[in-house]
UniProtKB/Swiss-Prot annotation:
Similarity-based family: Belongs to the arrestin family.
Induction notes from the record: By B.thuringiensis pore-forming toxin Cry5B.
PANTHER family given in the database record: ARRESTIN DOMAIN CONTAINING PROTEIN, PROTEIN TTM-2
Alphabetical list of Gene3D superfamilies matching this protein: 2.60.40.640
Species name: Caenorhabditis elegans
Transmembrane segments: none
Protein known as: Protein ttm-2
Record function comment: Involved in resistance to B.thuringiensis pore-forming toxin Cry5B downstream of the sek-1 and pmk-1 MAPK kinase pathway.
GO-annotated cellular components: cytoplasm
Family matches, as SUPFAM superfamilies: E set domains (SSF81296)
Length: 358
């Protein structure tokens, strides 16, 4: 049975990039005197694939399909080891005339562990591999990537206590930045029986946007359907795809974000052509990202037309790209610069402001 210990982990930053050193310290407060001779840190990263539920799945009666997990990183490092004063000075070992190694009697009788009766502080220093992918989690996504730092306390080879701390990893190499914007002008006609139709035209000055940017577009709808159109909705669709090791898509989930509708007009009458410019800002979404062999996220701008939100006649999507600033050219991070899909620990040595979207 593991001992009850209160752990407080304090790290030097709220997130890390591949190749950086995770530094900080951990404070251990035992409920009773505790002997420790070694403290290790275990860096663990895994990807989890979630199977999507079929439309006719009975949530109350049938169990959820199991998820599949693959370990990406499993690294260990010794953070602290008990040493006597003689051991630190190298005085505990001597050699005879045959160069045989012997321990002094003082060292042999000394304790091999340290007894802690109050809070003890141990350093943290462990390398994050350069190939580490970014942390990722989004409700409804077919895939998630999670990193943890486990602090393990040992005495005479037995693990007596442990604690896991979540880590956030950002990998800017997988984020699209060098994208050439281009204007978008598309027309689409949706045909119905008895020569009825709905025509849609949309003009976009660019197909590349930054987070929270104003989306300037013009939508024109020509209604030749049998009834008036009371529902026109504009929003961004997020598409998350899980990839296998050959970079092939094995599962995709579409997530609709909030959007806007007709600005003031209540309906588009039969035979009427109506143009409007909706007031719409890009939601606080992470940028397009592609992590080889793991996952990718893409976006599209969707226009939905119908009589009501539950009476949709037609919809059309146009691919767009959401980008972020080039962080490698900045010496300091600003609050509005970082948007990722993960929740971070609040235990940081310096409270660097950062938006972490769960």
């Amino acid at each position: 049975m593991l001992d009850k210990i209160r752990f407080t982990v304090l790290l030097d930053r709220p997130f890390y990039q591949p190749g950086q050193t995770i530094q900080g310290h951990v404070v251990c407060e035992p409920h009773h005197p505790l002997e420790i001779d070694c403290v290790e840190g275990r860096l663990h990263g895994e990807i989890q694939y979630f199977q999507q539920l079929p439309p006719n799945h009975n949530r109350n009666g049938s169990p959820l399909p199991p998820s599949k997990t693959r370990v990406l990183i499993d690294e260990k490092a010794q953070l602290w080891k008990y040493q006597t004063v003689s051991e630190m000075l190298g005085l505990d070992v001597f050699y005879d005339e045959n160069q045989n190694r012997h321990f002094s009697s003082e060292s042999a009788s000394a304790s091999s562990s340290s007894l802690f009766t109050t809070a003890a502080t141990f350093p943290i220093q462990i390398e994050l591999p350069h190939f580490a992918p970014p942390s990722f989690y989004c409700p409804g996504s077919p895939v998630s990537i999670r990193f943890t730092l486990e602090i393990q306390l040992y005495n005479q080879g037995f693990k007596i206590a442990s604690h896991e701390e979540n880590l956030v990893v950002l990998n800017y190499e997988s984020i699209k930045r060098q994208v050439t914007p281009k204007p978008v002008n598309f027309q689409k006609t949706f045909n119905f029986p008895k020569e009825r139709s709905i025509s849609l035209e949309m003009l976009l000055p660019t197909d590349v946007f930054t987070t929270t940017a104003r989306l300037e577009n013009c939508i024109t709808i020509c209604n030749r359907w049998k009834q008036s159109l009371k529902y026109v909705h504009l929003n961004i669709v997020r598409r998350i795809s899980a990839l296998n090791q050959n970079n092939e898509v094995i599962d995709t989930v579409k997530i609709d974000t909030t959007g806007v509708g007709l600005p003031s007009k209540t309906k588009i009458a039969v035979g009427e052509t109506y143009s409007f410019r909706p007031t719409f800002n890009v939601p606080a979404l992470p940028p397009n990202i592609h992590v080889n062999g793991l996952f990718k996220t893409e976006y599209s701008l969707k226009v939905t037309i119908g009589r009501a939100h539950n009476f949709v006649l037609a919809s059309y999507e146009v691919p767009i790209t959401i980008v972020t600033m080039d962080q490698s050219s900045r010496r300091s991070m600003q609050k509005e610069d970082i948007l990722v899909d993960i929740s971070a620990s609040n235990n940081t040595l310096n409270n660097l402001p950062v938006d972490l979207l769960a």
